[in-house]
């Protein structure tokens, strides 16, 4: 019996796994049926509809790091080169050729596309492979007779394994509904509608790429000062040289590093850092300030929002209060957004496998080579939490081809059609 892999969210990770599974089947190789459950549409989070962008900002990585990159498959001994060749049919370059945009893209110097164009590429691949998409929002995840069950208002999807993707909800904010506190979705909704933001003192909470994208947009609005609030001592620039990029596209040797070394590498290259392009814009704008601290709480008072910040100084916690006319909550993706969806049976299963409470730290440290929670059957794949254990490229767009290898090479349980293969990523037998 062919196994079923259900994926929550129809973004790049879902498309990458579905495309490789489709090509494996075209080669006559057993692969799971991939069913994607999506509330909005394929690539929605890369458009204004998803709330994470207005669709006009540029992709932060090279588009050539597409759904098959780095094209170094290790799933089918002696036929991996054939699999990679098949995957190039779904590459960024193939999309440009098929849509008569390739020559212009080359002549313009291979620019990063805007988010809207990236979403169009994902839809093009999904259409080409006939990706099975069930439209609906997952409201509950439970254990069923087959394995997992994903419950939407209209239907229930049963699967042998589940992969959870996506950044969570862009609507979350410190003070929901308050007109002086904007969520990520509120911000992009206004900019997509060409509404001018006018304020004296603006606070941007967050020091990562989500906040950076909003800062890049905010420069064009009528604000007097912008204070970026983050826990770091300063606004760090993301390392974008060859050696930093290699960490993302080739995780060989990552597991030989200590946890402390891995965390240090991730903080320097991925978490809480701005791209060099955004940093350059910050340098040219004297309205930008940085305030170190974590926001403990926010209260409206006297027509302003008062933020209480906690800062550690020499081991002592210091509390300060600051007032702003407008607060933008740009804290970004929540890798644990799915936890409230878990039914009690699912929580019990995961806590039993973890040997402790269901925390982000334990989940990260449990992620195995196949990007699933270790010690848990049926499989629950969490690539968004795989950075610490398996490599910093897995949670983002940096090695979608390797990610799909890991997941499709996993043992999906008693009903699985594929045996567990450990990928030999650096020099696969082809």
UniProtKB/Swiss-Prot annotation:
Enzyme Commission numbers on file: 1.14.13.59
Essential cofactor(s): FAD
Keywords: FAD, Flavoprotein, Monooxygenase, NADP, Oxidoreductase, Signal
InterPro entries: FAD/NAD-bd_sf (IPR036188), Lys/Orn_oxygenase (IPR025700)
Biological pathway: Siderophore biosynthesis; mycobactin biosynthesis
One function term, GO molecular function aspect: L-lysine 6-monooxygenase (NADPH) activity
Signal peptide span: 1-21
GO biological process, one term: biosynthetic process
UniProt-listed Gene3D superfamilies: FAD/NAD(P)-binding domain
Reaction it catalyzes: L-lysine + NADPH + O2 = N(6)-hydroxy-L-lysine + NADP(+) + H2O
Membership in a protein family: Belongs to the lysine N(6)-hydroxylase/L-ornithine N(5)-oxygenase family.
Task of the protein: Flavoprotein monooxygenase required for N-hydroxylation of the two acylated lysine residues during mycobactin assembly, thus producing the hydroxamate groups necessary for iron sequestration. Is also able, but less efficiently, to hydroxylate L-lysine (non acylated) in vitro.
Name of the protein: L-lysine N6-monooxygenase MbtG
Natural source organism: Mycobacterium sp. (strain MCS)
Gene that this polypeptide is encoded by: mbtG
């Amino acid at each position: 019996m062919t196994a079923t892999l259900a994926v929550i969210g129809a973004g790049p990770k879902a498309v990458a796994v579905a495309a490789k599974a489709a090509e494996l089947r075209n080669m006559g190789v057993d692969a799971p049926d991939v069913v994607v459950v999506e509330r909005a549409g394929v690539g929605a989070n890369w458009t204004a509809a998803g709330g994470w962008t207005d669709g006009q900002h540029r992709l932060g990585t090279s588009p050539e790091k597409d759904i098959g990159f780095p094209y170094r498959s290790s799933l089918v001994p002696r036929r991996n080169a054939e699999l990679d060749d098949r995957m190039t049919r779904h590459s960024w370059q193939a999309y440009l050729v098929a849509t008569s945009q390739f020559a212009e893209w080359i002549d313009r110097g291979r620019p990063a596309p805007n988010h809207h164009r990236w979403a169009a590429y994902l839809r093009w691949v999904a259409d080409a492979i006939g990706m099975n998409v069930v439209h609906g929002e997952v409201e509950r995840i439970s254990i069923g007779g087959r394995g997992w069950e994903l419950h939407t208002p209209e239907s229930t999807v049963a699967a042998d394994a589940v992969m959870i993707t996506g950044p969570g909800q862009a609507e979350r904010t410190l003070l929901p509904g308050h007109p002086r506190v904007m969520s990520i979705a509120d911000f992009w909704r206004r900019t997509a509608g060409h509404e001018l933001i006018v304020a004296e003192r603006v606070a941007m909470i967050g020091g990562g790429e989500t906040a950076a994208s909003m800062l890049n947009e905010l420069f064009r609005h009528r604000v007097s000062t912008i204070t970026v609030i983050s826990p770091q001592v300063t606004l760090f620039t993301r390392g974008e040289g060859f050696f930093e990029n290699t960490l993302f596209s080739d995780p060989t040797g990552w597991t030989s590093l200590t946890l402390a070394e891995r965390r240090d590498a991730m903080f320097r290259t991925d978490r809480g850092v701005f791209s060099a392009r955004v940093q350059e814009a910050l340098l040219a704008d004297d309205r930008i300030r940085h305030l170190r601290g974590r926001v403990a709480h926010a209260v409206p008072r006297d027509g302003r929002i008062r933020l209480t910040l906690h800062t550690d100084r020499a081991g002592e916690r210091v509390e300060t209060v600051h007032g702003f006319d407008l607060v933008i909550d740009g804290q970004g993706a929540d890798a644990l957004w799915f936890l409230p969806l878990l039914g009690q049976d699912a929580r019990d299963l995961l806590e039993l496998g973890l040997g402790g409470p269901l925390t982000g730290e334990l989940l990260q440290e449990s992620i195995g080579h196949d990007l699933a929670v270790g010690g848990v059957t049926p499989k629950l794949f969490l690539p968004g939490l795989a950075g610490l254990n398996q490599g910093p490229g897995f949670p983002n767009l940096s090695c979608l081809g390797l990610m799909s290898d890991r997941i499709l090479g996993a043992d999906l349980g008693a009903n699985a059609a594929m045996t567990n293969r450990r990928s030999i990523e650096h020099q696969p037998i082809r």
